[in-house]
Amino acid sequence: MFADKPTLQGDRVTLRPVGPEYADDLFELVTDPEVRRLTGSHGEFDREASRHWYATRSQHADRLDLAIIANGAFVGEIVLNELDEGNLACSMRIALIGARAFGKGYGTEAIDLLLRHAFTTTRLHRIGLEVFAFNDRARHVYKKAGFVEEGVQRDALLWDGEWHDAITMSVLRPEWRPLHGSLT
């Protein structure tokens, strides 16, 4: 379903297929302490393993990994993964690199571009995600993009000795409306 790896152009951001040219940027992203907290990532990351991982993303037709570029610089990644073709569903995740990306509308526009692509060029019916309850900024952006809270996974993350809930959200094709412009 995601064999085509498009470049998607918005007003402020461009989404480009992840490849080896973004390996160092992506390694910075996955090792950033705030990104690790917001995504609940406990594991360690090896630079060479990360380089190989990102160099092979274009070979997978069951996922779409896109770098978020603003003003010519890498500011994050957005991904459709965990494809369930039988149910026309997948998951979405997004991560932005701190101060150079937060609060500038890059995430909102990236999500809008990705949802527009997914719902107008594929047969997907449902796109879901999980977000930790403490991440109010992300929850607000997801709701603005059309995601609806479906449930709570209690005590889903143990971080610095404290338990945190995860919120399950999704957007369905019939409910989705683009934030900017029309579907035509």
Question: Predicted segment positions?
Answer:
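Conserved catalytic-core motifs of GNAT/GCN5-like acyltransferases
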Residues: 18, 128-131, 148-165
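Glycine-rich acetyl-CoA-binding "A-motif" of GNAT/NAT acetyltransferases
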Residues: 73-76, 137, 163
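Conserved GNAT acetyl-CoA-binding A-motif
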Residues: 120-130
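Acetyl-CoA-dependent GNAT
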Residues: 43-100, 117, 172-176, 183-184
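Conserved acetyl-CoA-binding loop-helix of GNAT-fold acetyltransferases
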Residues: 97, 103-117, 139-144
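Short glycine/proline-centered loop/turn elements that form peptide/ligand docking sites
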Residues: 107, 111, 134-138, 155-160
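A short, well-structured alpha-helix characteristic of acyl/acetyltransferase catalytic modules
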Residues: 1-52, 174-184
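Conserved active-site tyrosine of GNAT-family acetyltransferases
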Residues: 142, 147, 169
